[in-house]
Regions:
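Nucleotide/phosphate-binding catalytic cleft detector across ATP-hydrolyzing
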Residues: 1-155, 165-232
Length: 232
């Protein structure tokens, strides 16, 4: 990347902004809270804190589902908010933008990400749509120009992308509909079955991130929820 460049990863669960020379300048939950179906109430981590707790007149949602934009209006509101918050401090106007997208999405779905940046007031110098496996490999300083194959596995919230790269390109890539949210569901169901105890999605994610392991361990964590036997 030459000159001023901004990289953006629009994940289902979180959104990350990278600026060359500075590193990650924003890492927030990809969540928006809408008041009375029309007004932005909160965005990012602040909106995530309201998830599963908001009153009926506030809708908290994830605009990205399975790697693609599911709600273009809320997504535009969210990205406009983040750009407004960052632009004064990070001078984002006139930069080249690199947008990481899954390999197995349509050209129309890729265009939606492109249009998000075009529709802001940042006057981007140029917008590049980069396939996520390539962005992942470059971010990990992997040399994908060699003739030997490089396997990259990107586990997201709703999907997992498995790719093999060689000679600077993607040889094979598959996007499967299993991600971190499926692990959260498994935790919720396991605790409900074994302990007759109900927890929410946020609590399940906390358990996963704090003591989650592919191996059996003796670690434990205290969480809050509702006992199905007593109702408390």
């Amino acid at each position: 990347m030459l000159g001023k460049a901004i990289g953006i990863d629009f994940g289902t669960s979180s959104i990350k902004f990278y600026k060359n020379g500075e590193g990650i300048i924003l890492h927030e939950k990809s969540v928006i809270a809408i008041y009375n179906k029309s007004h932005t109430f909160a965005v990012g981590n602040e909106a995530y804190e309201m998830y599963e707790k908001a009153p009926a007149n506030i809708q908290v949602s994830y605009p990205v589902k399975n790697g693609v934009i599911a709600d273009i209006g809320n997504m535009q509101s969210m990205i406009d908010y983040f750009f407004h918050e960052l632009d004064g401090k990070k001078k984002l106007k006139g930069a080249e933008y690199y947008i990481a997208v899954p390999t197995d999405i349509t050209e129309v779905e890729k265009r939606a990400y492109f249009d998000l940046i075009t529709n802001t007031n940042l006057k981007p110098k140029k917008i590049h749509v980069v396939e996520k496996p390539v962005a992942d490999a470059l971010g990990m300083n992997l040399d994908i120009t060699k003739s030997t194959g490089t396997l990259v596995v990107d586990i997201g919230a709703n999907t997992t992308e498995i790719s093999v790269m060689s000679l600077g390109g993607i040889v094979l890539s598959r996007l499967i509909p299993i991600g971190g949210n499926r692990f959260d569901e498994a935790i919720i169901n396991k605790i409900k079955k074994d302990k007759s105890f109900v927890i929410g999605e946020k609590t399940a994610e906390e358990i996963k991130m704090t003591i989650g392991s592919a191996y059996v361990t003796d670690e434990s964590i205290d969480v809050c929820g509702r006992n199905l036997v007593t109702g408390l």
